[in-house]
Amino acid sequence: ILDMEPPRVNAYTLETSIAEKLEAIIHNGYFNSRYKDFYDIYVLSKKYVFSYAELRNAVIQTFENRKTPMTMDSAAFSDEFLNDPVHQTRWKSFLKKKKALIQVSMSDAMDWIKAFVRPLFEGTEKTRWNPEKGNWE
């Protein structure tokens, strides 16, 4: 083994991972049952600093590749989705089943995610995401 070349591992960047999850959320809309995508975006944005330009570029590329409109007008971000008892129950079940380390209400997670992704769609000139403050600077 020692005389073999090191293996090459292909992996998504965090920015591409977020872009892929965000596109799936927007694409699936109201009938989205991929609560892990919401949770992952929430957790990653609570933990890591992101470059606005790098993350926005990943989002643009992903949405263009999938031919998905870049808009926050998805039913997945609507009050109707958030207040739907079925989605609320499924969110709680997801957290329990996955033994989520960060327990967060669906409402709090969605508010945080919206603050994180909205400027990416609006093209607002920002520099970096501050995970401690929960805002773009």
Predicted regions mapped to residue ranges:
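Structured mid-to-C-terminal alpha-helical surface segments
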Residues: 1-137
